[in-house]
Amino acid sequence: RRQRQMCIRDSRQIMYNSKLLQTEEFNKMHSFCLDFIKQSLAESTAKHIVVVTHHLPTLEVVAPHHKGSVLNSAFATELGQLIADNRIDAWIYGHSHTNIDAEINGTKVVCNQMGYVFENEHIANGFEPGKFLVL
């Protein structure tokens, strides 16, 4: 946990209740949000369901050069079973600054992140300004 806090920029910059956001607070927020997603999925009668989160919903879309990193828990949560068990048309995510799409049990897991423009990540990571999603 300490290594994650030292290596991730967000851990040194995000304030919560007038102090740096701590892992425990983040985990509480994560649990609250995940419960909301689960409840919303269970109650939805919508024809199409799209989930949008900041973080990666599966390790399947972690960049190859980050596979196995101890820092992955700061970027992704393995929700592959949740995705497979629900009728989600698409899950749109961000945070990783790499653009990797996947499909899990018919669900499109997609992103189109610019990343840090001042570091030219939008060029290196294949940001597509005209990209769109068809359901």
Q: What name fits each language-model region?
A:
Residues 63, 69-89, 97-135:
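Binuclear metal-dependent phosphoesterase catalytic core
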Residues 1-50, 55-66:
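Active-site-proximal loop/helix segment associated with metal-binding centers of metalloenzymes
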Residues 52-57, 89-99:
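Histidine-centered catalytic micro-motifs
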